[in-house]
Design a protein with these regions (language model features):
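Conserved DEDDh/DEDDy metal-dependent 3′-5′ exonuclease domain
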Residues: 66-100, 105-179, 306, 314-420
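An active-site-proximal beta-strand-loop segment
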Residues: 82-88, 288-297, 302
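Long, highly charged low-complexity segments
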Residues: 223-297, 313-314, 334, 478-484, ...
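Accessory, charged alpha-helical segments in nucleic-acid-processing enzymes
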Residues: 287, 460-498
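Acidic, Mg2+-coordinating catalytic module of metal-dependent nucleases/exonucleases
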Residues: 147-154, 158-209, 229, 401-469
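Metal-dependent nuclease catalytic cores that hydrolyze phosphodiester bonds in DNA/RNA
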Residues: 1-106
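Short cysteine/histidine-rich zinc-coordinating motifs and their immediately flanking basic loops
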Residues: 26, 205-214
Length: 498
């Protein structure tokens, strides 16, 4: 079977995706994947036009010709070239030909790849090396350089392909071995799922199987180790957790994350606490959620939800272009300065990076200001949750945790990658409906953040302090209170084997 560039790229992201593509299976669709495909094609066309402007028909050809007499070839650029060998195939975006500089010196052939992103990845470089390998074998001569043109500025990166050739060769061997059988590779969910056309298919199958890869953060090594002892499902893993008494010298240090405890929380549908996590907010909470385009390091929407004396205000700071970024940062600082003792609450590293970059680009507020104090001590809820609070959810993502708490987004498909599609769509058409979808998604994230914060304040309340809602006490389990016992003692059936 021919290994195409399309199949090779899929394997780099996920073996299952590679297998499904090789069998021409149709995906259920993915808005982000569809958008990337459309934008990539448009970017390729624009890039080709830039390269060919002013060139004669002799200088640019639409296919690789004259391979038998490469020295006398007149063209300098071949477009959309189908390169093939016995088992490899790649539709190369363009091939640049640099004529020989004298007798005995061969012309150079450089495969060119157009990439929409500003920030390149290892996958992009491996794909360039794959193009070079196929072209080299087709021409019967070394191809030592690949070229990637990428991003809004059409930047150029040269890839030294010989250092990647061995790896590409080994990967193609693995792909060939996998595709030589009809056995579907093990289903493993990963970070690429959100960008894949097979996302809903694989997610459904993983849930049906109660597959271990549903647990976010479980590494391949950890999964294989569990598989080696007969543990393949989340439920099976849950029976392996055993509470242990920590040495006194370690009691003030945070425990490592236990995937088995998360599995137990899911099985029992209860929140489990490790140690004595505590979240107290001494001041007025400002629930912050920022939207941006990571590939461009551009932040275009700051949402801030503030509750004062029972009334809620939702602030929306929108940037039409990168020139407006400084303005919305200044407006945000002004909002903070108008709040009595503000406490910034956010979820994850995205906002942490946002603070650092805004300080670096535009400076911070005066040292003695209210805003400066708030920015020095923001509360990242994920640092409170990680390895201390185990929700009965597969991940610690805001959406999963808030859904468990009973919150629902008005658009169930709204997500971080979907927001990227919305923003790019808005930039092209300036449709107010698209902008409103982004603003609403951001506002609902802020609302979900408030709900999760209130829940954490409640469930991490120190012992001895009266609880606001004691009715939910049975839904929270302290690991320290769990009975320590040897699992599967004599006469007890092992549930893992069931």
């Amino acid at each position: 079977m021919q290994i195409t560039g399309h199949i090779f790229e899929a394997y780099l992201n996920c073996p299952t995706k590679c297998f499904l593509r090789s069998r021409n299976e149709a995906g259920a669709g993915n808005a982000y994947a569809d958008w990337v495909r459309t934008e990539t094609e448009a970017y390729r066309n624009t890039s080709i036009k830039r390269l060919t402007d002013g060139a004669s028909s002799e200088e640019c050809v639409t296919e690789l010709v004259g391979t038998k007499d490469l020295k006398t070839a007149k063209w300098r650029l071949a477009l959309d070239v189908m390169a093939q060998t016995r088992n490899l195939e790649s539709r190369i975006h363009a091939i640049e030909r640099i004529p020989s500089e004298g007798r005995g010196k061969a012309a150079l052939f450089i495969p060119v790849r157009f990439v929409l992103r500003n920030k390149l990845t290892k996958v992009d470089k491996l794909l360039s090396a794959f193009d070079a390998l196929v072209l080299s074998e087709m021409l019967g001569r070394p191809v030592s350089i690949g070229k990637i043109i990428h991003g809004v500025d059409y930047s150029t990166l040269k890839v030294k392909t010989p250092s990647l050739r061995n790896r590409v060769g080994k990967l193609t061997e693995k792909i060939a071995a996998m595709l030589s059988t009809d056995v579907t590779p093990d289903l493993v969910l990963n970070r690429h799922c959100g960008e894949c056309e097979f996302q809903s298919r694989c997610r459904q199958k993983a849930v049906e199987k109660n597959d271990l890869s549903l647990l976010s953060g479980l590494t391949e090594k950890e999964r294989k180790k569990s598989n080696s002892v007969g543990i393949f499902t989340v439920t099976q893993l849950s029976y392996t957790f055993r509470p242990r008494r920590r040495p006194r010298r370690l009691r003030n240090k945070r425990e490592r994350h236990h995937h088995s405890l998360r599995a137990l929380a899911i099985r029992e549908k209860k929140i489990h606490l490790v140690g004595n996590p505590e979240l107290t907010l001494e001041g007025t909470p400002v629930y912050l959620d920022v939207e941006g385009l990571p590939d461009r390091d551009f932040y275009y929407l700051i949402g801030a939800r503030i509750r004062r004396e029972g009334a809620v205000s939702q602030h929306v700071l929108w940037a039409d272009t990168t020139k407006d970024e400084q303005r919305i940062w200044s407006d945000f600082l002004a909002i903070l300065n108008g709040v009595e003792n503000p406490v910034l609450v956010h979820y994850g590293r995205f906002e942490t990076t946002f603070f650092k970059r805004m300080h670096g680009r535009y400076g911070g507020p005066p040292e003695d200001s209210v805003a400066a104090k708030a920015l020095k001590t923001p509360v990242n809820l994920l640092t409170v949750i990680f390895a201390q609070v185990y929700f009965p959810t597969y991940t610690n993502g805001l959406k999963e945790v808030a859904l468990f708490m009973g919150f629902n987004w008005s658009d169930i498909k709204a997500s971080g990658v979907q927001s990227i599609v919305w923003r790019h769509t808005w930039e092209q058409c300036r449709d107010p409906v698209v902008k409103q979808a982004l603003v609403q998604y951001n506002a609902e994230d802020c609302e979900a953040l408030e709900i999760v914060t209130n829940a954490l304040v409640e469930i991490t309340r120190p012992r001895g302090r009266p609880s606001v809602d004691a009715s939910k006490a049975d839904d929270v389990v302290s690991v320290e209170s769990m009975k320590r016992q040897r699992p599967f003692s004599s006469g007890t059936a092992c549930p893992i084997r069931r």
